[in-house]
């Protein structure tokens, strides 16, 4: 198990205008940790999606919501936890409601919802959801792509 070097916590009002603050702080942290430009862009998109999901769904426009973004910096990875204490949801029920997306499906005809989490899972190396008081999304990105391959081998054997 990797040893955590630093933890940075950011408290954001659950308002759309603060999503960029989470993205900007992440960019600086990931750059300092040694991530490539491409990996930083993936991280920024994933974290923006997670924060936006909290703003849009957990608090539904209420003014008093708060989102916590934690950056856990390890020697080989960055773990980002986006948590809210708003309205929770059941992922499996939500997946059934929106149904699967088909290859070649017309983008203009796609249903609204569900793409944010799909995008996060696509861009990150590991994603976990926790339903405590609200929802927490824990996203992990390894600095070295070989680490992802090594972890995959150890899991499959």
Curated annotation (Swiss-Prot):
It holds the Pfam family HATPase_c_2. This is Serine-protein kinase RsbW. It catalyses: L-seryl-[protein] + ATP = O-phospho-L-seryl-[protein] + ADP + H(+); L-threonyl-[protein] + ATP = O-phospho-L-threonyl-[protein] + ADP + H(+). The keyword Transit peptide does not apply. It comes from Listeria innocua serovar 6a (strain ATCC BAA-680 / CLIP 11262). Gene3D superfamilies: Histidine kinase-like ATPase, C-terminal domain. SUPFAM superfamilies: ATPase domain of HSP90 chaperone/DNA topoisomerase II/histidine kinase. GO terms for molecular function: ATP binding; protein serine kinase activity; protein serine/threonine kinase activity; sigma factor antagonist activity. Its EC number is 2.7.11.1. Negative regulator of sigma-B activity. Phosphorylates and inactivates its specific antagonist protein, RsbV. Upon phosphorylation of RsbV, RsbW is released and binds to sigma-B, thereby blocking its ability to form an RNA polymerase holoenzyme (E-sigma-B). The keyword Acetylation does not apply. Belongs to the anti-sigma-factor family. It is an enzyme of class 2 (transferase). Keywords: ATP-binding, Kinase, Nucleotide-binding, Serine/threonine-protein kinase, Transferase. It comes from the Bacteria. InterPro entries: Anti-sigma-factor_SerPK, HATPase_C_sf, RsbW.
